[in-house]
Amino acid sequence: MSAEVKAAVARYLDAVAGGSPAAIAALYAPDATLEDPVGADLVRGRAAIEEFYGALAGAKVSTELLAVRAVAGHAAFSFRVTTDAGDQQYVVEPIDVMTFDADGQITSMRAFWAPGDMVVTPA
């Protein structure tokens, strides 16, 4: 199961880098939850999750997996996400914790990061 979970994490990072909210949301189960960052309002359901990722539409985004641990339908992983937005570049290295169903869809995602973790530089 851990190989399948690691593959699902890779698909998620590829989808985030692709910048398509619909493609990202398709990786989630219909009744999945998302908390990004931890402490923010809980986002529930695929449609709401697609809306959440709407900020990425058309943005130039890259991702890099830094570490992943996967076991029994769960994954904890750190990664770097770089977003070029006009004249500024945003870089953050969150730690995401996800759970997956038997079909490999994300059932929950919690992202551990705070605004102070984001580095903003001129592009």
UniProtKB/Swiss-Prot annotation:
Its EC number is 5.3.3.1. This is Steroid Delta-isomerase. It comes from Nocardioides simplex (Arthrobacter simplex). SUPFAM superfamilies: NTF2-like (SSF54427). Homodimer. It is an enzyme of class 5 (isomerase). The active site is at Y12, D36. One of its GO terms (biological process) is steroid metabolic process. One of its GO terms (molecular function) is steroid Delta-isomerase activity. It catalyses: a 3-oxo-Delta(5)-steroid = a 3-oxo-Delta(4)-steroid. Keywords: Isomerase, Lipid metabolism, Steroid metabolism. Substrate binds at D96.
